[in-house]
Amino acid sequence: MTSYSYRQTSAMSSFGGTGGGSVRIGSGGVFRAPSIHGGSGGRGVSVSSTRFVTSSSGSYGGVRGGSFSGTLAVSDGLLSGNEKITMQNLNDRLASYLDKVRALEQANGELEVKIRDWYQKQGPGPSRDYNHYFKTIEDLRDKILGATIDNSKIVLQIDNARLAADDFRTKFETEHALRLSVEADINGLRRVLDELTLARTDLEMQIESLKEELAYLKKNHEEEITALRSQVGGQVSVEVDSTPGVDLAKILSEMRSQYEIMAEKNRKDAEATYLARIEELNTQVAVHSEQIQISKTEVTDLRRTLQGLEIELQSQLSMKAALEGTLAETEARYGVQLSQIQSVISGFEAQLSDVRADIERQNQEYKQLMDIKSRLEQEIATYRSLLEGQEAHYNNLPTPKAI
């Protein structure tokens, strides 16, 4: 390696990285060093050059590590301090940019590998096949729909049973009121029957009294007739010669016939009245007895119907309680299953959202990295073109002799 030395100024520059291996470069000659002022990406670059002679040794590092070092022996009059610092800063920036590019490329590769692995793991496969979940969810939805329909039918049946029970209760209350009314009528008829019985007894007593009175009248009549006959017989014997006699037998016969006619008439009237009252009472008793029998039959039928309805109501209430318990158990079981499935779906959706957000973030980072890479490539190309142009220019210069 050739070495050139000058009196006063020397410079050291290095490109550092994070990679392993290095390339040693040795060169000598007179150079006009470029001084580059500009921003990232090579925009607004201005170049100035100064003649200098270098004695350098260096190494270019890879992505992970390494260094580029050089020793410059520069003429005091050929390279100013500002341009030397600018060149050193440019070398440092180039090295850091190269390190960043390679590190970002490697990180990008690792990220792509991770994304590919994640997609392979999260991709459709036997462990990530959600078709059976969809089928289970569809079956559960069908079962829930069926249970809802059955529940609606049961609720409708319960409402119908409740309406029927209310109807039967209304009928029972009506029939009960009718029964009470019939029983009240029966009690009234019994009182009427008792009154009629008392009236019949009274009439019988009146008839007996009339018969006794008639017998008494007959006896008195006979006694009066006997007394009159005895009186008339004495008068006839006394007055037989004075005046014509009165036909007392005829008078008595007429009186007797009149009394007999009156007694027979009274007897017939009393008997007719008694028979009419008895016939009327018998008719009323027969009618009321028939009504009582019909009412008793209706009450028996209603009691039997009420017992049947109460039994049916109890069975309907028992079936309602059993169906409500079954419905609550079914809703609880399917609610737990549905909540579990919803939790699984929510977990998958959260994972999918995280993956999408991660992919979006990685895309943004990748775009930023590609933008930085493109700008770095532009700066590297600009720097390389400048170095190649200056190197070609300096190679054409005469080589100074070593001192």
Swiss-Prot record:
GO terms for biological process: cell differentiation involved in embryonic placenta development; Notch signaling pathway; response to estrogen; sarcomere organization. Residues 229-251 are annotated as: Linker 12. Residues 1-82 are annotated as: Head. Residues 391-403 are annotated as: Rod-like helical tail. GO terms for cellular component: apicolateral plasma membrane; cell periphery; costamere; dystrophin-associated glycoprotein complex; intermediate filament; sarcolemma; terminal web; Z disc. The modification Asymmetric dimethylarginine is found at R24. Residues 247-393 are annotated as: Necessary for interaction with PNN. Residues 83-394 form the IF rod domain. Residues 137-228 are annotated as: Coil 1B. The modification Phosphoserine is found at S14, S22, S27, S35, S40, S57, S67, S75. There are two types of cytoskeletal and microfibrillar keratin: I (acidic; 40-55 kDa) and II (neutral to basic; 56-70 kDa). Involved in the organization of myofibers. Together with KRT8, helps to link the contractile apparatus to dystrophin at the costameres of striated muscle. This is Keratin, type I cytoskeletal 19. It comes from Mus musculus (Mouse).
